[in-house]
Amino acid sequence: MINPSHMKSDFLIKVMYAIVSKYKIILALYILIQVIFIFFFPQEYRSDALYYFKLAEECYQSDQFYPAVQNLYEDYLVAPFYINIIILLLHIYNSTITISLFNLLVNLLQLFFIYKITQNYFDEKTARISLIIYILYLNTLGLVLLNYSELFFTLLIVSSIFFYSKNSILLFTLSGVLLGASIGVRPAGWALLISYLIISVYHIFKEKKLVFKPITVIAGMLFFILLFGSFNYFHFGKFIFTATTGPVNLLLGANETATGGFNARVYDKGNAGYIAKPDTMTFTQTGEFYQKQATNWIKVNTIKWIGLAPLKILHTFGYDDIAISSLAGTAEWNITRTIKFLTNDRNMNDILPTESIQIKVLYFVLQIVHHIYYFLLIIILILWLINNFKKKLFTESSLIHLLFVLIGTIMIVITVGSPRYKYPFVIVMIPFIASYLQSKLLTKNSIE
């Protein structure tokens, strides 16, 4: 008697085998689709993407780098290394298309490093699976059209990990330089440094001798930080090498109106983040004010602050519309807004009211298909974790990736959650998702 479950399993294996075996064609189509989106379906920047662009454009027009004199009285400084890259791009050609073409290059480089990391850790077959997993994760395609720092930041992280895995002092130093550059984009880069240090300390105690690898990595990191910080000091007067968003993120996750995610009510009059005359305070003074407000609240409401941790995790991992809406051309509507609207209004016709039925269908299909894929990746990752715990299969390489995700998640729990914050975590775990699929489903098949 034929077992239906075996038939389904065999069918799934055949489908996966067919997809992976055509990886070159899929990669070519992926590049073509990106080019088509960039030139024929450019996206209007909103939210942080628009804010980053305005910062870069103001500096470009005044022939300055970021931060500039006019940024002294901002609430905080964001992604200084990334903003300066955008300024240079605008000097080449002042258009958002220039940024998208840069993102296309970043995306392909990131894909290359994920492919090579997987190849180094496992084999060519698994590397091809990781390539397909990466391509099918549509947020990356959407990020190419936008101006967020996540794509560039993650490239710096994965390239640092790649060179860290090589046996060369020069490449260890390069790994450190890239690590320093990632910190220049987002403070979350510190999570990777801590991961490297934990692994190094383990080796020192295990082998009872000094390990030179972390020393060269730290030297490379400090080289970048000193170089970039000095560059900013000479044109801005302050040694700035990373974003100063830590205090405001801490406050967003530690106040009476905190929800676990971004909630602008904290800035309303009478609330913890309200500043009567913000234009009179420098970013340093504002940061000190936010940090004082947050830490005072945490001291008084420690249990409540700890209780917000699950909500921060939910806001980060519970849904995954980082850039999916942009692919449907509906950036004003995302999955969060849609759920809130349906909860309150419960009228499907009021969602995307100015769009055609075709756009509405495309929007919902993309959201549903992508979220099924996203949660499938999470399930496979959990299965990989369980399997490795049971069989004690963790290697130094896998632990670096895991520690980066764990420490990065702790940083989120301390501050505030956002679906964008997990993007690097998903990308760095793709090699291990691919390895689990290869070992459990495709081992008996030859992928040529």
PLM features: residue spans?
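Multi-pass, polyprenyl lipid-linked donor-dependent membrane glycosyltransferases
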Residues: 47-50, 77, 98-106, 129-159, ...
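Membrane-proximal stem/loop segments at transmembrane-domain junctions that anchor or position
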Residues: 241-344
